[in-house]
Structures are given as structure tokens and as C-alpha cells.
């Protein structure tokens, strides 16, 4: 039933985009608005059967819901590519609607999948949900391979990355952490003083993102700010920046 509703929704998106430039008196006749609209209308009309084939539900196939949704969105994009004479503004509109349709389809499945670990999954953005899904897939592999960080060696908390072309590596002093807490500051009550950095960025879509570090234990779903001990002899800003580079792998200036 969900797949059928998806088909109706995607078809509605296309019909709204087509209706902005042309109207149909019947399945074969076309009312022209302008020359560009005429060419687009012929392309869409010619691909009518193809549209139906692309969106038809595959009977008897046992596939995951997200896989089915992704396939429909991929076929929608391929279908859009057949209309080569689409005006730029209309092409942008169709692309935007297609992206929105993809989010509309995938988001409920990601929320359902991730809610088992994150009880606020329904409040997160689509971009965050996709990142969490990717991390959870990596987590499964790490648990299977027995990968877990340790603080007994200077580089025990760093994941080994095979060198690749164009890879940039931070200076060695930022790749190894100080072992032990003998150099760290403590309060009069014995509590350990910590430093933490808040790193944000704005995507091309205007979305504000914040850098969080996953737990060194892959079995836990915690995400924290890049934080660590505040060593004696250094200012708090320097300590925070050091932790951002050591734990977050991000080079930033204050």
C-alpha cells in the first residue's frame, strides 16, 4: 500500500511540473504555450508509457522498503534525463521536486530504523538521519571486527586509514595524544578540568551542522563534542583547539 501511495505522489509531482507550462485536453492532444513548452510536452507525452513502466510495482520481489524507495527515485531521475529540451528554470523545479520526493520517501524508513537507538530520530533533519545511518552501518562492521579504541598508547584512539592519493595528514604531534593525566589540571575538589570545542559549518543548502564525535566503544550510541583534559601550561583556547584536531581530525583556527 505504501508503494502505491508513493507512485501516486511521484506522479503528482510530475503532473504539477508539467501543468506549469502546458495542459492536456486528452492523452494525445497538446495545447502549446510556447516553443520550449511544445518540445517538453512532446518529450513527456512520448515517455508516458515509460513512466508507467518505471513506476510499476514489482510483484513477488522481496526487497527492503528503503531499497524500493531508492530505486523509484533513481528511475525518476533517469526519466527526467530523457527530456533534453527542458527550459532551465523548469529543469531546476523538477530537480528540486525530485529531491524533495526522495526525502519524503526515505525519511520515514530512516526514522523507523534509527529510533531503536536514538529516541529523538523523528526530530532530526534528513541530513543528520543519513549520517547516523551511515555511521550505524560502520558500527556493525567495527563490532564484527572487534575494533575498539584504547587509551593505553598515544595513537590507540585513532582509526588507521590506508593512504590514498590526495590525502592530507596532520602533523605528527596532533596524531598522538598524551597518555595519562599527570599533566592535566584539577580543581580543589579533585575534579578534572576539561576543554571542549564547538565546530560548526554551513552547507551549500544553508543547513547549519555541528561536529560531534562518536564513542570509542562501537556498541554505544553516544555522540560528544571533541573534548579532553586541560593540560597545565596551556591556555584554554589552545587546549580546545588541540582536542578538535586530535579527536575530530579537523584543522581550524580560532
Swiss-Prot record:
GO molecular function per UniProt: hydrolase activity; metal ion binding
Limits of the Nudix hydrolase domain: 191-254
Signal sequence range: 1-19
This protein's record includes keyword Metal-binding: yes
GO CC term (a single one): extracellular region
Motif (Nudix box): 228-249
Entry keyword Nucleus: no
Keywords: Glycoprotein, Host cytoplasm, Host nucleus, Hydrolase, Metal-binding, Secreted, Signal
EC numbers for this chain: 3.6.1.-
InterPro entries referenced in this protein's UniProt entry, alphabetically: NUDIX_hydrolase-like_dom_sf, NUDIX_hydrolase_CS, NUDIX_hydrolase_dom
Pfam families: NUDIX
Induction: Expression is induced during host plant infection.
Free-text comment on this protein's domains from its UniProt entry: The RxLR-dEER motif acts to carry the protein into the host cell cytoplasm through binding to cell surface phosphatidylinositol-3-phosphate.
PANTHER family, alphabetized: DIPHOSPHOINOSITOL POLYPHOSPHATE PHOSPHOHYDROLASE, DIPHOSPHOINOSITOL-POLYPHOSPHATE DIPHOSPHATASE
Name of this protein: RxLR effector protein CRE5
Organism per entry: Phytophthora infestans (strain T30-4) (Potato late blight agent)
Upper taxonomic lineage: Eukaryota, Sar, Stramenopiles, Oomycota, Peronosporales
Gene label: CRE5
Amino acid at each position: 500500500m505504501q508503494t502505491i501511495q508513493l507512485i501516486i505522489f511521484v506522479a503528482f509531482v510530475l503532473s504539477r511540473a508539467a501543468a506549469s507550462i502546458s495542459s492536456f485536453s486528452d492523452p494525445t492532444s497538446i495545447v502549446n504555450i510556447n516553443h520550449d513548452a511544445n518540445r517538453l510536452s512532446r518529450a513527456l507525452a512520448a515517455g508516458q508509457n515509460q513512466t508507467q513502466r518505471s513506476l510499476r510495482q514489482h510483484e513477488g520481489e522481496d526487497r527492503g522498503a528503503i531499497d524500493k524507495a531508492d530505486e523509484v527515485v533513481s528511475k525518476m531521475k533517469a526519466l527526467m534525463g530523457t527530456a533534453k529540451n527542458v527550459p532551465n528554470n523548469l529543469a531546476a523545479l523538477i530537480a528540486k521536486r525530485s529531491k524533495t520526493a526522495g526525502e519524503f520517501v526515505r525519511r520515514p524508513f530512516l526514522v523507523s530504523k534509527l529510533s531503536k537507538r536514538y529516541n529523538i530520530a523523528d526530530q532530526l533533519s534528513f541530513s543528520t538521519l543519513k549520517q547516523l545511518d551511515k555511521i550505524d552501518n560502520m558500527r556493525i562492521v567495527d563490532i564484527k571486527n572487534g575494533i575498539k579504541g584504547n587509551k593505553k598508547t598515544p595513537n590507540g584512539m585513532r582509526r588507521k586509514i590506508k593512504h590514498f592519493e590526495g590525502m592530507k595528514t596532520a602533523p605528527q604531534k596532533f596524531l598522538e595524544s598524551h597518555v595519562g593525566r599527570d599533566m592535566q589540571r584539577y580543581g580543589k575538589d579533585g575534579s578534572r578540568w576539561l576543554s571542549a570545542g564547538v565546530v560548526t559549518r554551513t552547507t551549500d543548502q544553508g543547513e547549519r551542522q555541528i561536529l560531534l564525535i562518536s564513542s570509542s566503544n562501537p556498541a554505544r550510541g553516544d555522540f560528544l563534542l571533541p573534548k579532553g583534559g586541560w593540560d597545565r601550561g596551556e591556555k584554554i583556547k589552545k587546549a580546545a583547539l588541540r582536542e578538535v584536531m586530535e579527536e575530530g581530525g579537523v584543522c581550524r583556527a580560532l
